[in-house]
Amino acid sequence: MIKRRYLILLLLPLAMISLFVGVGEMSLAGLWAGNPQDWQLFWTSRLPRLMAIVVAGAGLSVCGLIMQSLSRNRFVSPTTAGLYDCARLGVLVSIILLPSASIFVKTGFAIAVTLMGAMAFMSILATLKHRDTVFVPLVGMIFGSIISAFTTFIALQMDLLQNLAGWLQGDFSTILNGQYELIYLSVPVLILIYIFANRFVLAGLGQDFATNLGLNYKQTLFLGLLLVSVITGVVIVTVGAIPFLGLIVPNLVSLYLGDNIRRTLSHTALLGALLVLFCDVFGRVVIYPYEVSVSLIMGVVGSVIFLWLLLRRYRYAS
């Protein structure tokens, strides 16, 4: 596996490229000369977009890592556990109950409904006698489809479907200074995940084993789901859904570094940020001057890698 410093060395030049790629003209020479238009574009759009990409990519990748540990299944993530759909339902509820609600209130509703959905998903898993590698995420995707269908039905009845369009896919083109800072809430949550990483490792061993080791399993499970829900809710409200990210990145890292969360956490965050940044830059240049959303590119890349992971697991299992 690529060492941490190599991931950073890949991330830095790609971040520099990201700052200077886009429809608006901005150059290093212009910044050096103090061109006010270049600096305005830098502070208003390019830097906020870069920061949002890095934080969202790192956050969602780590969410997948925690979900996989708590569910004891390699293919569980916010995408395959229906958490994105729950977050969108939370946003819809906030729009219905409080039409003039601020983004902070919408985020609060998104986090609350995501947490309830995550707890419901884990409760469903607890009733399953056979936790097959593929069957568990299939259950999660069915659960998410039910939530999504319910959300769409309510939105249609309330004539609010158009209001939800912005949260259906991840898109960083609308990120501007003063409209994205809420995503920074993910940073202290990531720090908390690192602090409690060992507890999540023990929880991933199963309730009986973890309890015998002195761990309060239910408390740790709730804490993990809460932290995942906060990041998921914040990212959904700020930039929208980015499919498969939390599924493929932890799997790619664990192939080489194992399942110790504390050991793989930084690699997972860096690789997630790097992958989203690459997809964003590619989306900006592939049909320039138009843009392809990150969620579309990530959906294609993620589905291919997901299929490869499935085939690889079955090949080695046989």
Where are these regions (language model features)?
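Alpha-helical transmembrane segments in inner-membrane proteins
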Residues: M1-S318
